[in-house]
């Protein structure tokens, strides 16, 4: 759980090895963001509220491939970080 002085940031990680159009990539990021927000509403509503009140910050990063993305996803799950993987 974040301390009161910490700002929360949603981190969206995309795969660099996929050749998606900008629109498709934006849509996939949107799916992930919505699913994470819904999951956070169930699992940690106070953190979600804090995130929203502080500007709902988001950043987009790249993973080189699926294996790297799976490792990041597993690490996030192990640390009890709200996460969601879009599978298309």
Write out the residue ranges for each language-model feature.
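Positively charged, small/polar-rich N-terminal and surface patches that mediate targeting and assembly
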Residues: 1-88
